[in-house]
Amino acid sequence: MKAWEQKYQEWISDFYHGELLFFAGFILILFRGMWLSTMFPQNRMLSLLSIPVASLLIGLKILLFDHYPVKQFLMLWVVLICTMLSCYFSHTVNAFLMILLVLGSKDIEFEKILKVYLVIVGAVMVLAFLASTVGVIENLQYERENKRLRNAFGIIYPTDFSAHLFYLLTVIFYIKRNTMKSIYYLGSIGLAGVIYYFCDSRLDSVSILILVGLYWIGNEIENASFVSRNIQKKWNVFWKSVGIYSVPIIAVLSIGATFLYRGTSTFWVDLNKFLSNRLSLGQNAYIKNGIRLFGKNIEMVGFGGTTETVLDYNFIDCSYVHILLVNGMAFFCILLALYVLCNKKNVKNLCFLYAIFAVAINCMVAHHIVQIEYNVWLLGIGINCSKVTRRIYESNDFS
């Protein structure tokens, strides 16, 4: 018996085993989400089974390898309970999976998470693209009013395909942040053009251009000899004082625009048309359902998975309005607070703040903010490893 106890103590004393538990659960959740976003045949039983299995793996990592002060531990339980209540009332699971991964990512090297994300999401994207081009799965094609053809390339909808590419690019840029070359910027601009041409996805094309612009301008300001120190200082001060609040600022603007929308105003009508009716759809959902503390199950009727005409389209695309109405005020506040905390922990890393800003802009129109198969950035909240974990990393050469 003592031998088993000794082996157990030795096992939990090595944080590497905690990493294995986390990444096993992370890969399972990530692969499930990616597979559901493709046109490949779906197995509902396996999809449902993957959630408790992944939760068990990550839960074991948290229980056996993570240590918190009492106040922080109680706060985490409040967050988890509020999230679970939100999922119960909204009949959704994405919020729970995101919070579970946020809690489980404690002391996990963030770039490892990004690289695993890049491999899994990239591999499924390539597989779906190739399968759709040779006819193994359907390449859904939609025709706009202007006769432009939109391709989904094996994903359930063209904008979901382009969104995957945008989020992959945010990860690639961050990983390559210290060795950025002109070819990366030019290639990304070209990708934005390709996405616009084949998918007619304005949002993700513009989001990629914003990402390229932030990285290019930021690198020029930081490294170019012709830029004065005064400009460098102002740039840094802006991002470290205002940039860390980019998500709540953009969330308030998005929700405010939705609630202030008036169908009798030319300005609001034109803006609503430019945003593909996002404002009117969001406002209608608010009037019909209201805002609740822990959310509500709102039936979403949208495009995707089929090319059949949808007559009663009713989908809340704006992430911030979506979270507020579906997941409730409690989880909405938790999410914004986590993003602020995440940015504050990475405040010295401007490239991290650039990525969050680009994602925040994208989420004004798209609904992917708590879908881990798209948005992995909130897991950066665990980037600051404890002293004990740092020593383990250094001794095992994990970097």
Specify the residue positions occupied by each region the protein language model found.
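Hydrophobic transmembrane helix bundles of membrane-integrated enzymes that assemble
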Residues: 2-33, 47-66, 71-266, 315-391
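Juxtamembrane/transmembrane-helix boundary motifs at the membrane-water interface
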Residues: 31-49, 304-313
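A structural signal for alpha-helix termini and helix-coil/disorder junctions
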Residues: 37, 288-291, 367
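Long extracytoplasmic/lumenal interhelical loops at the membrane interface
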Residues: 269-327
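Membrane-proximal cytoplasmic C-terminal regulatory module of class A 7TM GPCRs
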Residues: 393-399
